[in-house]
Amino acid sequence: MKKILYTTALMLVAAVVLTSCGDHLDKKEMKQVERQSTVTYTINSSQDLIDAIDLVVTYKGKGGINVSDTISDTTWTKTVVNDMVPVKIGLSWSMFPKADSNISKDTLDLMATYIIECNEVTDKLNEWVDFIRLKDFPASKLGALCDLENHKQNCARTKGGRYETPCFIIAPEMIGDGLKYDWAQWRD
């Protein structure tokens, strides 16, 4: 029974969302913007994980439209170029365990990164975001739990105007008796 519930829990979606490129500009500034943003998404995972699960990634494609792709290799990369501002930038993934797969914390070896180039009025924003490997997630970094029914993704500007990016991931430490997975919010 525990294995069935554990497997079912892994079907939850681990969502990661950044922000909008240029969403803070007013209409006058929008006319002066070099209207281009480039995002390169990369997901690296272990062969053990690929063998144990079906991994489906959803990313914000051209125009901010959600595009889904199934990952079958240990490295997946996608570059999206937009000629509009603002544009939504985001990435999420879903894990679906394969039949008879033996999934442990060490199997959850996945790291997502993305590089953002957002051309705006004053300067060019180049931001590189690196999400930790799931299996290396320390209990000391565990932040506020999110309500699964009312889960909201958010981000906040730092003092320098850059975005502090919350990373919502599945935290193995939250399994407890093996019957429950929860969303966790991690910040460096």
Stretch-by-stretch model annotation:
Residues 31-188:
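First exposed extracellular module after export/assembly in secreted or surface-exposed proteins
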Residues 1-9:
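Bacterial N-terminal signal peptides that target proteins for export
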